[in-house]
């Protein structure tokens, strides 16, 4: 995961100090890209331990089209707690936009199902896109989508994915985002009869919060270790049929966890 450490170092050394919505303050750069070859291991950060359970359950929750944190709470995942209302609702966030984008004529568009179908029928299409950024509903969301749009690309029997992330919390959020979209790409590839290719991560405002500088410096002192391998149940051929038990991580040997406060 040298690419991730390079991003962190680049922002610390070359970023601009800015104010932000949370009042914490950031150091940020605008425009950056990382690439991960999914054939060379699963890109789960090794310079600090990550909670893979949260990453997998959040992705499954997105794919269900769910926007209430009950499923997450039932599975001991708390990453969305700060933004939910008293009933656990988040408004029309990722899952709703992915699976039930409202059209002007009253229809609801299942963007994920449509993309799976198009990858199978027309893999050379340049329209294999899912957007979570719906301007008409942004104000109703507890948190507007940070990872806003992603596109798939098929070449030489491999499926690749590029994510555009408008806002990226480098220390806390980005490691989760890398693993989540890498896993989604692998799942999509399997159900479409393809191999996983690359995950390309493109950023708009990539930032380190000021209260994460010490943690970032500590992480930069650590040597990356070999990437783990993600095993996915080969029997699952329906993207929406995956369960937590269908994933097994092998060979994950990270450095210890580093605590940091999330800015809400």
Curated annotation (Swiss-Prot):
Gene Ontology BP annotations: dTMP biosynthetic process; dTTP biosynthetic process; methylation
Domain of life according to the entry: Bacteria
Sorted UniProt keywords: Cytoplasm, Methyltransferase, Nucleotide biosynthesis, Transferase
Enzyme class: transferase
Chief location bin: cytoplasm
Any one of the GO CC terms: cytosol
UniProt KW Methyltransferase keyword: yes
Pfam family, one: Thymidylat_synt
Pathway(s) annotated for this protein in UniProt: Pyrimidine metabolism; dTTP biosynthesis
GO molecular function, one term: thymidylate synthase activity
Binding site residues for dUMP: 21, 126-127, 166-169, 177, 207-209
Catalysed reactions, as listed in the record: dUMP + (6R)-5,10-methylene-5,6,7,8-tetrahydrofolate = 7,8-dihydrofolate + dTMP
Places the protein is found: Cytoplasm
Residue positions binding (6R)-5,10-methylene-5,6,7,8-tetrahydrofolate: 51, 169, 263
Subunit structure, as described in the record: Homodimer.
Protein name, entry field: Thymidylate synthase
Species of origin: Neisseria gonorrhoeae (strain ATCC 700825 / FA 1090)
Lineage of the organism: Bacteria, Pseudomonadati, Pseudomonadota, Betaproteobacteria, Neisseriales
């Amino acid at each position: 995961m040298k690419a991730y450490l390079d991003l962190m170092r680049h922002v610390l050394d070359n970023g601009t100090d800015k104010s932000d919505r949370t009042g914490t303050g950031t150091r940020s750069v605008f425009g950056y890209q990382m690439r991960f070859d999914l054939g060379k291991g699963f890109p789960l950060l090794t310079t600090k331990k990550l909670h893979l359970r949260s990453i997998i359950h959040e992705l499954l929750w997105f794919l269900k089209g769910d926007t209430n944190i009950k499923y997450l709470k039932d599975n001991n995942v708390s990453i969305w707690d700060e933004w939910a209302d008293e009933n656990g609702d988040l408004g029309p966030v990722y899952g709703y936009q992915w699976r039930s984008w409202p059209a002007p004529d009253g229809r609801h568009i299942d963007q994920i199902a449509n993309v799976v179908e198009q990858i199978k029928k027309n893999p050379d299409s340049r329209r294999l896109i899912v957007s979570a950024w719906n301007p008409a509903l942004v104000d109703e969301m507890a948190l507007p989508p940070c990872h806003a749009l992603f596109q798939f690309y098929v070449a030489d029997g491999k499926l690749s994915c590029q994510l555009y992330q408008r806002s990226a919390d480098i220390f806390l959020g980005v490691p989760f985002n890398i693993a989540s979209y890498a896993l989604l790409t692998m799942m999509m590839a399997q159900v479409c009869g393809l191999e996983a290719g690359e995950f390309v991560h493109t950023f708009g405002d990539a930032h380190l919060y000021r209260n994460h500088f010490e943690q970032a410096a500590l992480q930069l002192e650590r040597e990356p270790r070999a990437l783990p391998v993600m095993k996915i149940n080969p029997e699952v051929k329906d993207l929406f049929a995956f369960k937590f038990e269908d994933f097994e991580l092998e060979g994950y040997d990270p450095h210890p966890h580093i605590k940091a406060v999330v800015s809400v």
